[in-house]
Amino acid sequence: INYIIRRWKILLLTLLIYLTSKTNTMRIQNALISVFHKDGLGPIVDALNAAGTNIYSTGGTQAFIEERGISVERVEDLTSYPSILGGRVKTLHPKVFGGILSRRENESDRAQMDEFDIPYFDLVIVDLYPFEATLASGA
């Protein structure tokens, strides 16, 4: 787990540098953020907000971001479906996966994205919840 945390922090620092770079040529229009471990996330959402990125999020991550005074699009509003199974199923929906897996250069994909009003996700930040601890708790 320490390796994963170190990699997470490296990713966050890299993304922060990218977002604040004057030579950034790709605008991140929509970001999906749903994480269990929120340490280090603050500067990233601040930078995304400053860059004008629409942030989509779930549950605790949404609350964390809103506590920073940043507007968040609720994934539940996007999907018109609630988080289920104790919060373990939140983003498993065609409107989420379509936004992640779509190919912008593909005319058919673009037509379906428009038809079903699916946002393109330019950035996805997720991590894993502590599965073993959750399992041991009986959840």
PLM features per residue range, with description:
Residues 13, 28-30, 128:
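Short secondary-structure boundary segments
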Residues 14, 20-25:
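Ala/Thr-enriched low-complexity intrinsically disordered regions
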Residues 25-78:
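N-terminal glycine-/serine-/threonine-rich phosphate-binding loop
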Residues 60-136:
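Glycine-rich nucleotide/cofactor/substrate-binding loop typically near the N-terminus or early
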Residues 139:
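Short glycine-enriched, charge-decorated loop/helix-capping segments at active-site entrances
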